[in-house]
C-alpha cells in the first residue's frame, strides 16, 4: 500500500513550527509495513487543499491528513475531504457531549465555532480524542482510506495509540527490529539482497544508524500468532546470512547487551581507556544497575598514568609508543589486576587530527584480557574525524566483548 502524508497549516509553511507529525507518522506507518511515498505541506487555503488532496488520490491508496480539525474558520480539512467524496458532515453526539462538558467546567456555553469540532464526515469511523476535543476519523472508499488527525502532536499520537489495532483494517500487524554491528548498510543489503527484494509479507527494511544497522521485519495476518510465526521464520533466514553481526532487538543498545551478557554469565568487567577518555565506561554507567557487572575504568590519558596506575612498563612505551599492540595488552592486563575482574578492556590509539605516535590517525588497538590470556583487535578508521574515531572505538570494544562472552560462560571467570 502506498501512502501520502498531508500536513495542513500555514504556520508550517512559514516555518513557525516544525512538521514533527510527518516524522512520527512515517515511522508509525513503516512499522505497519506501509510505504510512505510522499510528504506534502499545504496552507489553510481551500483551493490549494483541494488541489493537494486530489493529487494524493492519484498517487496513494492511504492518505493521512493532520491538522485543520479545529474550531476556527481556517480549519477546513473535514469540509474539503467531505466535498471531494460527495459526502456531508453531521454532529457526532459523543464528541459534542465531550466538548459541552469541557466548556461547562469553565463556565462557558457552546458557540458555533466550538460545535464545528464535533462535525464528522458521513460514514466515517470516529476516532475519539482523549487528549483534546476534536475527534479524528477514518473514511473508507473503494479506492482509498483517509485518516484525519489533529495537528497537535500529543493529540495525534494519543489517537494513534488508542485506535492502532483497527485503524488500518482488520489485519494484525506485527513488527520486529533486529540490530547489527560490524557490517555497513551496503554490505548488509548485498548479503540480504534477494530477501529484501522479494519479501513482501513479511517484509524487510534496513535502516542505517550511527555505526550500526537495524532491520525492521513486518508481518500482516488475520491471526496474531500467524503473524508472529511469519516473523520467526523470516528472522531465521536473516540470521542465517548475517547472524555473526546480530546483537539485539528493538531499542536495545550495545552496552545494555554487554551488561546483560556479563550478568548472565556471572562475569565482572573493568576497563583502561586512553584515546576514549572514559567514553567506554560512560556508556555502561548510563545504564542503571551497571555496578553489578562493571567495577571501574582507569582513564590513563598520559603515559605517566599508564605506568603509575596500570603498571605499563616505561621501557615498552619508549620502544613502541602508547599506540601499539603490546601497550594495549599491558593496559588490559593492568586493569584486570587493578580491579580484580574477570574481563578487562583496554583502548589506545590515535584519534587525531594529528598523530603524536607516528601511527596513522585512526589507528586503534583494543585489547581484551581474560583468564585464558589477552586478545587484541587492531582497528583502522582512516576517513573519520576525532569524535567518530572515539565513538567507533567504544562500540567496537563493546562488540568485541559480545563476541567473546556467551551466557553461562565459565572459561572467562577468574
Swiss-Prot record:
The lineage of its organism: Bacteria, Bacillati, Bacillota, Bacilli, Bacillales. It comes from Exiguobacterium sibiricum (strain DSM 17290 / CCUG 55495 / CIP 109462 / JCM 13490 / 255-15). Pfam families: CinA, CinA_KH, MoCF_biosynth. Belongs to the CinA family. Transmembrane segments: none annotated. The gene is cinA. This is Putative competence-damage inducible protein.
